[in-house]
Curated annotation (Swiss-Prot):
The keyword ATP-binding does not apply. Belongs to the ycf49 family. Keywords: Chloroplast, Membrane, Plastid, Transmembrane, Transmembrane helix. The lineage of its organism: Eukaryota, Rhodophyta, Bangiophyceae, Cyanidiales, Cyanidiaceae. It comes from Cyanidium caldarium. It holds the Pfam family DUF2499. The chain crosses the membrane at residues 13-33, 43-63, 71-91. It is a multi-pass membrane protein. Signal peptide: none annotated. It is found in: Plastid, Chloroplast membrane. GO terms for cellular component: chloroplast membrane. This is Uncharacterized protein ycf49. The keyword NAD does not apply.
């Protein structure tokens, strides 16, 4: 747990809290402004993948970057790449209309 400084841990934890708040706010925004449910579902699913990626990064650092848990780092990188690709695909399809 000592692989990161306290301010860096603060940034990691605050980012996870921020993602969870934004997921909830997007849900409420699409609910109150009658935005299509498909938009709501897709954007929240993608944001959950980003959130999981950050959670994996925190777990990796919490255990001092242990080489036994290398799969966590690989999963975090895969989730980030997956999320970035599909977020770009989703945004381009949404604005292509």
């Amino acid at each position: 747990m000592y692989s990161l400084s306290l301010p860096t841990w603060n940034i990691h934890i605050v980012t996870l809290v921020e993602w969870s708040i934004v997921i909830r706010l997007i849900y409420l925004f699409t609910y109150f402004y009658d935005i299509p449910r498909s938009f709501n579902f897709l954007i929240i699913i993608l944001m959950i993948f980003f959130f999981l990626s950050g959670l994996f990064a925190c777990c990796w650092h919490f255990f001092n970057n242990n080489s036994i848990l290398l799969w966590i780092s690989v999963a975090q990188a895969a989730l980030t790449a997956f999320s970035n690709f599909f977020f770009l695909l989703f945004i381009s399809a949404y604005y292509h209309k």
